């Protein structure tokens, strides 16, 4: 069997990534059942799962509908696993769950924190001789994951910011105040500037990057 979970902030693409993971699992023919952990890694710790294989059998259009479903179908969390050298109890329980549900592969869809979680689980598996496979599926509007060019979620967020900025510009142009005005827009992106840079590309002659 295998398991998939989502974590971090929702994007317009994260459920499409879920649909892609499920499609790949089905095409591989290697797994009997695909479970979904509710609210990320907390779903494993709290024994809260969905049997996605059963849901797909009952709803043939399930995967196609997920491609355009907003928010996060499996729910999210912001829980960070401790370093296993400091406290390995969550890891021991998680791998006990994997054994109970006969999990051979775990897919985690998310951003930097989620990739940190999947790496910790992989490292612990290697350290303790476990055989499960761990795969991180990138998702972040920040576009700041290593070894990626455009992360799923970045494009839709950049498009939204560009459209919103143009609307603000039109509002400012339509005002008849005699005094000039300055509008400041704050854009998300943590320590990365990709979203701001993506917006700036709309005005190459006016917005120095």
Could you say what each language-model-derived stretch is?
Residues 137, 141-148:
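Proline/glycine-rich low-complexity loops and linkers
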Residues 11-21, 44-45, 82, 89-92, ...:
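Short glycine/serine/threonine-rich phosphate/pyrophosphate-binding segments
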Residues 47-104, 113, 141, 152-154, ...:
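Glycine-rich oxoanion-binding loops at beta->alpha junctions
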């Amino acid at each position: 069997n295998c398991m998939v979970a989502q974590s971090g902030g929702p994007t317009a693409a994260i459920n499409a990534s879920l649909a892609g993971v499920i499609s790949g699992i089905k095409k591989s023919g290697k797994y009997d059942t695909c479970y979904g952990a509710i609210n990320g890694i907390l779903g494993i710790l709290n024994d809260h799962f969905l049997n996605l294989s059963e849901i797909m059998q009952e709803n043939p259009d399930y995967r196609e509908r997920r491609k355009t479903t907003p928010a996060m179908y499996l729910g999210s969390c912001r829980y960070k696993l401790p370093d296993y050298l400091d406290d390995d109890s969550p890891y021991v329980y998680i791998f006990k769950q994997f054994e109970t549900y006969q999990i051979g592969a775990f897919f985690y869809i998310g951003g930097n924190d989620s990739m940190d979680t999947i790496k910790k689980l992989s490292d612990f598996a290697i350290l303790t001789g476990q055989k499960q496979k761990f795969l991180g599926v990138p998702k972040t509007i920040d576009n700041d994951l290593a070894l990626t060019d455009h992360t799923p979620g970045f494009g839709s967020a950049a498009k939204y910011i560009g459209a919103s900025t143009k609307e603000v510009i039109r509002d400012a142009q339509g005002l008849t105040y005699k005094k000039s005005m300055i509008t400041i827009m704050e854009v998300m992106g943590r320590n990365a500037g990709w979203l701001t840079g993506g917006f700036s590309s709309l005005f190459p002659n006016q917005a120095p990057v």
